[in-house]
From Swiss-Prot:
Name used for this protein in its record: Urocanate hydratase
Family, per entry: Belongs to the urocanase family.
Higher taxonomy: Bacteria, Bacillati, Bacillota, Bacilli, Bacillales
GO molecular function, one term: urocanate hydratase activity
Gene: hutU
GO biological process, one term: L-histidine catabolic process to glutamate and formamide
Entry's cofactor comment: Binds 1 NAD(+) per subunit.
Originating species: Bacillus cereus (strain AH820)
Keywords for the protein's UniProt record, in alphabetical order: Cytoplasm, Histidine metabolism, Lyase, NAD
Keyword Cytoplasm set for record: yes
Disulphides: none
Biological or metabolic pathway of the protein: Amino-acid degradation; L-histidine degradation into L-glutamate; N-formimidoyl-L-glutamate from L-histidine: step 2/3
Amino acid sequence: MEKVKQTIRAPRGTELQTKGWVQEAALRMLMNNLDPEVAEKPEELVVYGGIGRAARNWESYQAIVDSLKTLESDETLLVQSGKPVAIFKSHEDAPRVLLANSNLVPKWANWDHFRELEKKGLMMYGQMTAGSWIYIGTQGILQGTYETFGEAARQHFGGSLKGTLTLTAGLGGMGGAQPLAVTMNGGVVIAIDVDKRSIDRRIEKRYCDMYTESLEEALAVANEYKEKKEPISIGLLGNAAEILPELVKRNITPDLVTDQTSAHDPLNGYIPVGYTLEEAAKLREEDPERYVQLSKESMTKHVEAMLAMQEKGAITFDYGNNIRQVAFDEGLKNAFDFPGFVPAFIRPLFCEGKGPFRWVALSGDPEDIYKTDEVILREFADNEHLCNWIRMARQQVEFQGLPSRICWLGYGERAKFGRIINEMVANGELSAPIVIGRDHLDCGSVASPNRETEAMKDGSDAVADWPILNALINSVNGASWVSVHHGGGVGMGYSLHAGMVIVADGTEAAAKRIERVLTSDPGMGVVRHVDAGYDLAVETAKEKGVNIPMMK
C-alpha cells in the first residue's frame, strides 16, 4: 500500500460539494473516517482494526470522491471492496451508495486467500465501520464497552466496579475505549499496549489517565486506587503475552480480565513476544508465515494466562477479537472455557432491539450535538441509565473529527429519535443535516459465532441469512448507504455483517425514509432473537407489535 501524506478533513458548514445532502453526507463521512483525529493510519487509508480501510487504494479513494461529487439524486454508486465499480440510475428513495467489502465464498474465506487478492489489488479489509464510512473514533464503541463493564459490575460486584482491578490489553481504535469505560463504572484498570503511540493517543483524548513502562509502578498505583475505591486508568507499555504470564507467576489475580488486542489478524494486528514494533515490521515483511506462527504461539500463551486467572477467581471474558479460536486451533483445547462478552453481558439488550446507535453533525458545530443530547434527556427521561450515559459523555468524551454522539437505543426509540432530529433540521434548530448510523455490531445485523451470535439458544450461531436480510430490508426502505462486509472484528471466515446509514436532511421524504429504516433495522434484531427462542425478544415483539408470522 502506497503511503500518501495528505491531511483529509471533512468539509463543515452548509455549502455543498455535491448535488444533494445524501451524497454530501457520504462524502463527508468517507473523509471523516480518514481525518487524522479519527483514523489510526490515515496515510495508508487505515481507519482502525489492524488494516480496516476506508478505500482500497488512493486511486480508488479519489475515484469515489469524484463519483460522489457528480452523483445525481436518482443514481446509486456501487463500491466493491473499496473500489467504485458502477453508477446506475435508481430512484430518489434508493440508497445513494451500496458497498460490499471483503466478501469471499466460504471455502476461500481465509486470511491466506484474502492476502493473495489484496496483494493483487483486488480486495481490501473493510472491518465494520471503516469500509462503510461511519467510524466516529473511539466514542463509537465506548458506550457498548461501558454497558459491558456495567453489566459485569451488576452481575458480579454489586452494581459498581469501585474497589476492583480490571486487566486488559489493546488500546487501538476499539480497545482504546476500555480505560474510560472502566473508570466510568468506578473501577481501576491496567490496559497494556505494545505501541506507545496508542497509549499516548488515548491519554491525549482523555480516554486514559496515565502512562507507565513499569509493571511495578502500574501495580502500585492500581493497588493504591483500588484500596481508596477511586477510579484510575493506567496505560502500561508492554506485550500482554509476556505480562499476563508474569502476573500469574507472581500469583496476582485481577478482579476482571479481558482483551482487545487485534488478535483477529495474526499478521497485521498482533505483535509476537520478544519483538519490538520495528523488529516485528521487518519480520512481517521478510517472513510473513513465520510471523503468523509466532503471533499464534504468543496468543496461546496469552489465553493460557487468562484461563489461569479465571481459575484463581478472575471474572474472565473474551472481548470479540477471536483470540480463543486462535489458541484453540493451536491445541489449547479449553480455550473456550471463558465466555464471550455478548452471551455473558449484552444479549438481553439485543433481544429488545437495542444496539450502538450513533449520529454525526455534518455542520461540524458541537452545539448541534449538544442540542441532540437535550433531546435524549427530555424524551427518554425515564431511562436513568441512558441519561447518565449522555451526561457523562458530555463531560468526558472528546469529539474526534466531526462532532458525534453514540447511545444504545432500542426498537421504537430509534425511529422516535430520528423523527425528532429530522424536524429539528427542518425548522432550523440544527444548523445542518445529521447523519444517523450504527456499528455492524448490532442486534440483527451480524452473524459471528465467536462474538455477537456466540452460544445462541437454538444453536443458530453460524446462520448468516440474517445480516443479508438486514441489508436488503434497509436498502428497499431507503437507507442512504448500505454495506455488507465479511470478517469484521474476528477476522476472515468468522463473520458476515451489514451496516446502514440514514441522513436526516429535514425533508418530508427523509422523514418517511427514517421512519421505515429506523423501524426495520432494529426490528431485525427483535426478529432474529424471537426466531432463536428468546422469551425477552418475544415479549418485546408482542409489546411493540412486530409482525412475525410464526411467533408463538
